[in-house]
């Protein structure tokens, strides 16, 4: 099962019947242990620092419902529906492993809500990332007991109003069920999975922009040769160099290294004196270092995918229910450090794509270094007309903002919960920052690709490689040659709408064959 397909594509989920029987067996085992008063965290104890308080069986439902209500303490704006759907999907997958004590009925109700588009209202703020994402998952779980609010068809309403319309009945939770729903990493992992998907698309766009600008600026083909890149030993660098060759194949705008050497020889007198030519044997870094810069971005995405996918398919509950009370694992599988650090790495990679794009934009616009293109790509009479001067301010501003967002969250632990939670991951903060960075870098790349589309009007457009011509054709339909006749923000928004919506995703995937597994996926069973 693909998280993105469920979260964004609104594909439904179906619970495996055989696995539900395993879930039921574990649930019944926990209910029996609770009645027999075996000491077990969250079954017959208080929560967190209150673990030393023993709770008699007659309060089993009160204990679980109180947990959900008291820990539904999130703040800030609610997550958009697609993030909520990702969170629900990942939590269902964790609980379907059969190690948590949840009832099949609770899982079926959660899946029904997901399939009918009934989305719990989950505020963005409030998670420390250990014990898991308590606040957001409590908000996710409230509707199961008829509490809280849900959003359906974009309208937020009390849960019971929607349940009554849909013929759904809230549950009375048994031993450990509330804890099973909230004590895990599913909020950060759901958000991180969407950030990873978006980062992969941004890498494709970054490659397309890079293949475009080296043609617009008549750059050298030599930096992308296989031989030179292969001796560096990094697989990602070799892949990016290959993709740059693929995306520029057939171009009539780039320069062969031998031709550059020949031109230099023709310009010099071969005397023993120092001579200055106007020919550069090598291009600036933003036209030359894509294999090195984007290669490590590619490998970082691959590493982060492994961390996030493993977490999405993990049992991240506590305690982990095994065959007997004595074997049951009281530990810390709820801790989100893997996801937190994956998101921090991912944030740096996404921010670096923004840095590269902003520098490429500057090289395309700066009248001192962008010859033979007009300054700021003004269509005529530069100075009277400003061209993309204003667009550069937006890109540079966002690139600077990104430097703050890329600072790590996973090392910013603050003790809480009576010193019980004395080292936490801040994983959801890291995931939220990564999502914000993806939005920001999407805007920077939109400015760059709008400018590259404008640059094609000042070059021999027919000489671009076929993949880049297809991009120009697509963008030209919504953003024709810019002549200062409309607000620059309109141009950027139109280009962004093409690049970052489904048609842009499909086009980029068809043009850029990244060496990544197709989708972040969930295993169907334990």
From Swiss-Prot:
Gene3D superfamilies: Fumarase/aspartase (Central domain), Fumarase/aspartase (N-terminal domain). PANTHER family: HISTIDINE AMMONIA-LYASE. It catalyses: L-tyrosine = 3-amino-3-(4-hydroxyphenyl)propanoate; L-tyrosine = (E)-4-coumarate + NH4(+). The modification 2,3-didehydroalanine (Ser) is found at residue 131. Keywords: Isomerase, Lyase. The keyword Signal does not apply. Coiled coil: none annotated. Substrate binds at residues 71, 183, 288. Belongs to the TAL/TAM family. Disulfide bonds: none annotated. Contains an active site 4-methylidene-imidazol-5-one (MIO), which is formed autocatalytically by cyclization and dehydration of residues Ala-Ser-Gly. Its EC number is 5.4.3.6, 4.3.1.23. One of its GO terms (molecular function) is tyrosine ammonia-lyase activity. SUPFAM superfamilies: L-aspartase-like. This is Tyrosine 2,3-aminomutase. GO terms for biological process: toxin biosynthetic process. Homotetramer; dimer of dimers. It comes from the Bacteria. The active site is at residue 41. There is a cross-link at residues 130-132 (5-imidazolinone (Ala-Gly)). Pfam families: Lyase_aromatic. Has aminomutase and, to a much lesser extent, ammonia-lyase activity. Primarily, catalyzes the rearrangement of L-tyrosine to S-beta-tyrosine, which is probably incorporated into secondary metabolite myxovalargin. The aminomutase activity exclusively produces S-beta-tyrosine.
